[in-house]
Each structure stands twice: as structure tokens, then as C-alpha cells.
Amino acid sequence: MVPEYSRFYNILGYNFKDYTLLIRALTHRSKTKKNYERLEFLGDSVLSFVIAEVLYKQFTDLAEGKLSQLRSKLVKGTTLAQLASSLKMDEYIILGASEQGGNKREKILEDVFEAVIGAIYLDSDFATVKKVILKWYQPIISSINLDTIKVKDSKSKLQEILLQNALSLPEYSIETIDGKDHEQQFTVVAVSKDLNLRVKAQGTSRKKAEQKTAEKMIEMLSQQGLHEKK
């Protein structure tokens, strides 16, 4: 065990055999080309599968659509960033000079969380990384109450409203991308041809901008008397 990481290993609940994998998982691209991006890609897939499996087994009466919506909520950026902070990952992130202070940024925390999962998977095996992930997620999963939780994201809700009213789905497109690589601002436009609506919103990622655009369109549809049918 590398002394300076012994505390971090205890927090994670996992001891790396190859600590260079952990270093890579914590290293932002502003520091070096040998950064966490590939591990992030791997960790994203591992996390998605583990969460999908546990939801499938725990909520046996939940339909596929609801399972997908609940999984999306559990693996969204805000959730991952909060988990990363609770595991003190922000204290160990390695940044270049141009990114100093970025260890508290949600997108970086989200990426590092997924990268660490990818690193644990490569350092061990699927059974081990699954056990670690479920330990991290246990408080969240055990507190899920399907009677009170809103699992439907705005794009899914908008889709249901339109389909229930025999209307075509909106088309999303990026209008502009402003700012530096690590501080990009996406402007997304959603167009509903059947309703002759054009809605625009901004976000720090394409996904967030699309969700905000969908929220705006739902509000406009509500004003026209179109609501989701229960």
C-alpha cells in the first residue's frame, strides 16, 4: 500500500494492487495525456450494468420504462458528484495548472467517480467492483420509495405527453457551444413540428441542455392544456 493513499483506500473500501490505475483514474487531462478519460468510459458501462441489475432484482414489479428512468436518476451527474464528494475523491484529484480549483466542479467529480470504478474493475474483477459499488450506493438504494420519488426525467415525460396526444416527438439539435473545453455552455433547440413550437435552453452539457429544453416545452404544453395522462 502506498502510504499517502492508505486513508483513501479505507474510505473507498478497496485496496489497489496496482496503484498506478488509481493515479490514472484521478488525473485530469489538463495534467497529462495519461488521464482518466478511457477509465471513465469503462467505469460508466460497469456502473450502468451494476445499477441496472440491482434495480431489476429489487423492484420485481417495476416495468422496463420505470426501471430505465430510475437507473437514469441513480447514475446522473449530480448523484455521481455527490457520491464522489462523500468518498473524498475531490481531495485526491490531480489537476493541471489551468484547472486549479476544479476538483469541486460537478463534471470533474462525476468523471472521476466513473474512472475510479473502471480502475477498480481492471485491478480486480467484476464481482469485486460490483460489491464496492453496491456498498457506496447502499444508502441511496435502501431509501428509494417508489410512492414518493419522481423517477421520470423531463425528456421522458415530454415524450409521453406527446405520444399520448398522437403528436410526433421533438427534434433536438445543438445551436451553439460556447466557452473553453472545461467550461462549455451548450445551447440546445427542440422543435415540435406538429405544434409549431421551437424552444431553446442552455446547460453545461448537451444532456442537461436537452432536459432543460424539455422542461420548457412541458410548461408551454401545460399552458395549452396538454398534460401527462395518469
Swiss-Prot record:
Residues forming the catalytic site: D44, E114
Question: Where is this protein chiefly located?
Answer: cytoplasm
RNase III domain: which residues? 5-125
Q: What InterPro entries does this protein's entry cite?
A: dsRBD_dom, RNase_III, RNase_III_dom, RNase_III_sf
Reaction catalysed by this enzyme = Endonucleolytic cleavage to 5'-phosphomonoester
Main EC class the enzyme belongs to: hydrolase
Q: Which UniProt keywords apply?
A: Cytoplasm, Endonuclease, Hydrolase, Magnesium, Metal-binding, mRNA processing, Nuclease, RNA-binding, rRNA processing, rRNA-binding, tRNA processing
GO annotation, cellular component aspect: cytoplasm
- Extract one GO molecular function annotation from the record: metal ion binding
Extract one GO BP annotation from the record. Answer: mRNA processing
Q: Which cofactor does it need?
A: Mg(2+)
Q: Which Pfam families match?
A: dsrm, Ribonucleas_3_3
The places in or outside the cell where this protein is found are: Cytoplasm
Q: What is its EC number?
A: 3.1.26.3
Q: Which domain of life is it from?
A: Bacteria
Q: Which residues make up the binding site for Mg(2+)?
A: E40, D111, E114
Q: Fetch the SUPFAM superfamilies from UniProt.
A: dsRNA-binding domain-like (SSF54768), RNase III domain-like (SSF69065)
Which intervals hold domain DRBM? 153-223
Assembly: Homodimer.
Q: Which HAMAP family match?
A: RNase_III (MF_00104)
Q: What is the protein's known function?
A: Digests double-stranded RNA. Involved in the processing of primary rRNA transcript to yield the immediate precursors to the large and small rRNAs (23S and 16S). Processes some mRNAs, and tRNAs when they are encoded in the rRNA operon. Processes pre-crRNA and tracrRNA of type II CRISPR loci if present in the organism.
Family as reported in the entry's similarity comment = Belongs to the ribonuclease III family.
Q: Which NCBIfam families match?
A: RNaseIII (TIGR02191)
Name of the featured protein: Ribonuclease 3
Query: Can you name the source organism?
Result: Francisella tularensis subsp. holarctica (strain FTNF002-00 / FTA)
Q: Which gene encodes it?
A: rnc
